[in-house]
């Protein structure tokens, strides 16, 4: 059976060799070529028609971001995974690449001198992403069971009775494809009458840059969450990389709690942790949305939300980069609605508006 055909793009001959050897060792993957910069990658993508491209960001002649833009400008939708350095500069460049149309990213090998451990870390991060982004040849990247038509909006279980007093909290979980999906969703929402807490699987530095970027773009506050921070209506708090984000409550209202408890679902922050804490804090008055992402993080938490009378929405398969997390929720019958990405915002507004008298009053954000 043919493998997933991958093109490796990097200006370092050492990295090209290491990544090619690592991928070729997997029986489901075939490295069909390499390229030394973004310009050469354009030619190789057209010639070789790979199933997926791995792309360095910093390269001579044409860097990875320019190459992604050029590939997308031709209408080619081949999945592209960026190699990113875990630095402030690398975080900014990676977000730029995702905005240009890259599908995902993995940390670049930081210490070629420690080849064994470094490449094992790359293998653990890269190969599952490749197999999730190229769903073919018997490889199943999302749960089997529920099949959603490409343009369908699906109701999978009876809607929960609206909580008395309305929803008090919106929680969102996302992973692969999540930065662009979350940005698109938030751009459809005005300042809300409830606080928003988000877990996006990202490393440290990346979440801070991501929150800052959204804060510049949106007409309300988006912050990287800090410990014991008030969660106020009309604001969005994003979990910092390597910390679980929990919601707590006291006499003054809702607050954040950050912990470095063990990872759940191999993730820290984990969506399940956020969802579980939301139920503990507000009971049935929680509204959750599960966006594109690899794996099933959020499914256990979604079940708790539903069992307590809260509501869960999921992004549909057609608009997800990877229908793992939302697919797990849909397959388990936990989502009240499975919707295209750009229909989630209006659905959230509809649910908040029917249970609350209004959105945030004028001046409430000052």
From Swiss-Prot:
Record EC number: 3.1.1.61, 3.5.1.44
4-aspartylphosphate modifications at: 56
GO cellular component, one term: cytoplasm
Taxonomic superkingdom: Bacteria
A single BP term in Gene Ontology: chemotaxis
Disulfide bonds: none
Post-translational modification: Phosphorylated by CheA. Phosphorylation of the N-terminal regulatory domain activates the methylesterase activity.
Positions of the catalytic residues: 175, 201, 297
Intracellular or extracellular location(s): Cytoplasm
InterPro entries found in the cross-reference section: CheB-like, CheB_C, CheY-like_superfamily, Sig_transdc_resp-reg_Me-estase, Sig_transdc_resp-reg_receiver
Matches recorded under Pfam families: CheB_methylest, Response_reg
Catalytic activity: [protein]-L-glutamate 5-O-methyl ester + H2O = L-glutamyl-[protein] + methanol + H(+); L-glutaminyl-[protein] + H2O = L-glutamyl-[protein] + NH4(+)
Start and end residues of each CheB-type methylesterase domain: 163-355
Record's keyword terms, sorted: Chemotaxis, Cytoplasm, Hydrolase, Phosphoprotein
Main localisation: cytoplasm
Keyword Transcription: no
GO molecular function terms attached to this record: phosphorelay response regulator activity; protein-glutamate methylesterase activity; protein-glutamine glutaminase activity
Keyword Cytoplasm found: yes
Annotated Response regulatory domain residues: 5-123
HAMAP family the record matches: CheB_chemtxs
Family: Belongs to the CheB family.
Domain statement: Contains a C-terminal catalytic domain, and an N-terminal region which modulates catalytic activity.
Biological role: Involved in chemotaxis. Part of a chemotaxis signal transduction system that modulates chemotaxis in response to various stimuli. Catalyzes the demethylation of specific methylglutamate residues introduced into the chemoreceptors (methyl-accepting chemotaxis proteins or MCP) by CheR. Also mediates the irreversible deamidation of specific glutamine residues to glutamic acid.
Protein name, entry field: Protein-glutamate methylesterase/protein-glutamine glutaminase
